């Protein structure tokens, strides 16, 4: 695995950061997943994120990488977290998803997760970065220097984070299901 410092990174472009990380890991992708996190209201509470000094942040979506080894152990790679790169899933879950603090949020804030095998993510994701444009056409945050990621369509990122939509070879899970999927056997 690359260190976080060795992996391509641009702040506020988590979907592309994960894509570029997985691209660098080819051909050894069998144990890796891109995990898109969002919900119906596009407001997901997460903790331990670098973007805020407050303990929590509300993102419209977030994308991370998780590896699931043959022994059942899982590690999380989140470019935007204060938690260690390659931390075990349970530690990441406890600190970032923070179920104790989540109790103060209404049900509509519950997160959903689209689990995409790495190879599928590399052939599926297309982003024209239009979601990062202001009304005047300028970028809200500086875009990455690498070219746009375009596969089968001009842009499907907003569809991928819509957890009601179905995509072949992807799985949408709730908080209980993802914990079960990535917890040690």
From Swiss-Prot:
One of its GO terms (cellular component) is nucleus. Belongs to the NTAQ1 family. The keyword Hydrolase applies. Mediates the side-chain deamidation of N-terminal glutamine residues to glutamate, an important step in N-end rule pathway of protein degradation. Conversion of the resulting N-terminal glutamine to glutamate renders the protein susceptible to arginylation, polyubiquitination and degradation as specified by the N-end rule. Does not act on substrates with internal or C-terminal glutamine and does not act on non-glutamine residues in any position. Keywords: Hydrolase. Monomer. The active site is at residues 14, 62, 78. Its EC number is 3.5.1.122. This is Protein N-terminal glutamine amidohydrolase. It catalyses: N-terminal L-glutaminyl-[protein] + H2O = N-terminal L-glutamyl-[protein] + NH4(+). It holds the Pfam family Nt_Gln_amidase. Disulfide bonds: none annotated. InterPro entries: N_Gln_amidohydro_ab_roll_sf, NTAQ1, Prot_N_Gln_amidohydro_ab_roll. GO terms for molecular function: protein-N-terminal asparagine amidohydrolase activity; protein-N-terminal glutamine amidohydrolase activity.
